[in-house]
Amino acid sequence: MLEEYRKHVAERAAEGIAPKPLDANQMAALVELLKNPPAGEEEFLLDLLTNRVPPGVDEAAYVKAGFLAAIAKGEAKSPLLTPEKAIELLGTMQGGYNIHPLIDALDDAKLAPIAAKALSHTLLMFDNFYDVEEKAKAGNEYAKQVMQSWADAEWFLNRPALAEKLTVTVFKVTGETNTDDLSPAPDAWSRPDIPLHALAMLKNAREGIEPDQPGVVGPIKQIEALQQKGFPLAYVGDVVGTGSSRKSATNSVLWFMGDDIPHVPNKRGGGLCLGGKIAPIFFNTMEDAGALPIEVDVSNLNMGDVIDVYPYKGEVRNHETGELLATFELKTDVLIDEVRAGGRIPLIIGRGLTTKAREALGLPHSDVFRQAKDVAESDRGFSLAQKMVGRACGVKGIRPGAYCEPKMTSVGSQDTTGPMTRDELKDLACLGFSADLVMQSFCHTAAYPKPVDVNTHHTLPDFIMNRGGVSLRPGDGVIHSWLNRMLLPDTVGTGGDSHTRFPIGISFPAGSGLVAFAAATGVMPLDMPESVLVRFKGKMQPGITLRDLVHAIPLYAIKQGLLTVEKKGKKNIFSGRILEIEGLPDLKVEQAFELTDASAERSAAGCTIKLNKEPIIEYLNSNIVLLKWMIAEGYGDRRTLERRIQGMEKWLANPELLEADADAEYAAVIDIDLADIKEPILCAPNDPDDARPLSAVQGEKIDEVFIGSCMTNIGHFRAAGKLLDAHKGQLPTRLWVAPPTRMDAAQLTEEGYYSVFGKSGARIEIPGCSLCMGNQARVADGATVVSTSTRNFPNRLGTGANVFLASAELAAVAALIGKLPTPEEYQTYVAQVDKTAVDTYRYLNFNQLSQYTEKADGVIFQTAV
């Protein structure tokens, strides 16, 4: 084992990275070596045991905790470990498999003082809290000490407070840094391996950034040169962290700019991030990791500057001269406590533990922690989002700025973030989900899996289902197209994908750490954002699609001066706020998702859309049959699926919807008259904010076209199919087609559309994300593309690609003629589709499809109603 491990260490060192943590097999071999250590290896073996094993409920942690417990009880022997040392090491494992041995040790006079000290600083107690409380009530003095320590918040007060002054060297990335820059999609397979994945950060050359190997390895030498100044680095940018929810972006930044976490291999916390604008999901993920994110004017900060940041005073000064460079205000003073606690999640768990201990001891509420500012009382009404979050908190509504912890009814996880979520769940010692429904998909890696992806496909489903979650299968399709069909109206949820944007209810997408917390605990921390209201009125004009309305939102915001495309001094009214949409109440739920989904591109924290009851009733009746069909097909966890079906049936028995109050307050209101939108609206390369009418970009030569992603539904493929079917001869473009789900693919096949796609020469992908994320298949380098996908960041769909975002209808026309049409040409083509619109835009009602109803009708529930 040692020979193999040292070989691995040498291989990793050649890449300039730390070795991987020990796995369960290596840990088992280490146990045998510790029992009979080879001469001269003693110190090395102890270091491996102490510092190179993941904490929580990792498989290796299970072996480690079992061995240390046996040493503590005298059931195993090692010349390197005393029972006292074993208890001390158990105390470094954070939670999970180490807890019971520590609690047992409270009854051993020799070990109890060490165990009590360890438990005093262990936060992940969950129901084991009551075991300690029981011992304390029975008179165990050490258990009493632990309870008092928790009540006094010693776990928090013994950690260093945030310093008055932070001296750092500026690592500045000008313009916008999106999460694809920090965690490139083609490298998604390596995300759980933080040191390896971090090598790809900023691997594409850009102003001021010098990658070691462009397109492969980021600016490691540049970072190391700045570190020679002797101070930690701070990540600084005009706009930071837009785009996907990937926690790997934060992991990579902190790998170079954060601090080691004692006894936790290959993970870092802390760090400082300064941005003119910091995207909300990235901001939250930084908070969760114990970093200090600050929104501040960075125009006076340059690469390599040494600066002093005063977090309490809200000042940034030149380190040498003391010149004032910028002022700021922390988003919330609670950030100061979050940094001290090692992150927002440890703070929440720790505060909860302190509160529980004080209640058990009959003590008043602790005054140790900073509280979120009280929100001013208001006699105004609540918006729809404020009412939804309020209901999830057991109150009528939640005002903007208020801190709350809403109940998580639905949680989603996908396969490029799922392995990180699994690691976070292990770190949280989670063996069962508290959220009502947790769903895992395999949509980003199913098409062209690497061996590491195949391993994920084999291992992640059982991990999720064993904890009571629902696991999809590779080839089933896109996370959102499935999760939407499992939702309950007016409820709150989250997901480890920035496009988790519920069309019924509301969701606040998050990084893997927060998603794991929400799944494990059933709640999620939220500083309630303000809302921006977008009101549509009037009638849609001929040839105009919902995708055009999606793009009308940034276009009209630009017209009102509420959004700028320029990154320096970026204005974005939607950033960090909730987008609330009204005026389209009769949309089908599948259509409504097109609008809520795109709130991700606005950097909005969440989105609601006001719908009438009828489309929601239709949707739920269909979804009940789909979920029963899943049970018949052997999907699990069965109890969770049955419980969700019962939840839908309960709502249908009394279908009431929350509504915004007429006098609700909004940060801004954008009115859009549908009569004014007479031509398609696209987003130009390479920025989803850069919305333009078709006439402004007409005639642009197009090389490739992609019709797919979570922004599409079956109607889009029928429309494209009808346009393609009328075309004779070869397409002048390369066309990619990827239906969102296996159900869409089956129905399109049955209706003959797959034959049409095949004849046209289209490349038909399996249901899933396909090109959208750019982590597997990609368009040709430098291609000009029309895509129905979610976002068009630089290099996302292909290296150097120029991507226009557009409707499926416009994309199909571009595929046919090899260029962007004029508005008149476009109208000529889509008139063909409009003639059969009733047939084209039919949606999947599973309760009307015999292949689903026949199986669903045979399902007998196994859980009590």
UniProtKB/Swiss-Prot annotation:
Cofactor: record remark: Binds 1 [4Fe-4S] cluster per subunit.
Protein's pathway: Organic acid metabolism; propanoate degradation; Carbohydrate metabolism; tricarboxylic acid cycle; isocitrate from oxaloacetate: step 2/2
Catalytic activity: citrate = D-threo-isocitrate; (2S,3R)-3-hydroxybutane-1,2,3-tricarboxylate = 2-methyl-cis-aconitate + H2O
Binding sites annotated in the UniProt record for substrate: 191, 244-246, 414-416, 498, 791, 796
Gene3D superfamilies given in the database record: Aconitase, Domain 2, Aconitase, domain 3, Aconitase, domain 4, Aconitate B, HEAT-like domain
Annotated knockout phenotype: Cells lacking this gene are more sensitive to peroxide stress. The acnAB double mutant does not grow on unsupplemented glucose minimal medium and does not respond under aerobic conditions to glutamate. The acnAB double mutant retains a low but significant aconitase activity.
An individual GO BP term: regulation of translation
PROSITE patterns on file: ACONITASE_1 (PS00450), ACONITASE_2 (PS01244)
UniProt-listed Pfam families: Aconitase (PF00330), Aconitase_2_N (PF06434), Aconitase_B_N (PF11791)
Alphabetized GO MF terms: 2-methylisocitrate dehydratase activity; 4 iron, 4 sulfur cluster binding; aconitate hydratase activity; metal ion binding; mRNA 3'-UTR binding; mRNA binding
Keyword Metal-binding: yes
Disulfide bonds: none
Record EC number: 4.2.1.3, 4.2.1.99
Entry keyword set: 4Fe-4S, Iron, Iron-sulfur, Lyase, Metal-binding, RNA-binding, Tricarboxylic acid cycle
Cofactor: [4Fe-4S] cluster
Complexes and interactors: Monomer. AcnB can also form a homodimer. The monomer-homodimer transition is dependent on iron availability and the carboxymethylation of C-273 inhibits the dimer formation.
Other facts: AcnB is sensitive to oxidation in vivo.
Similarity annotation: Belongs to the aconitase/IPM isomerase family.
UniProt protein name: Aconitate hydratase B
Source organism (scientific name): Escherichia coli (strain K12)
UniProt lineage: Bacteria, Pseudomonadati, Pseudomonadota, Gammaproteobacteria, Enterobacterales
Gene: acnB
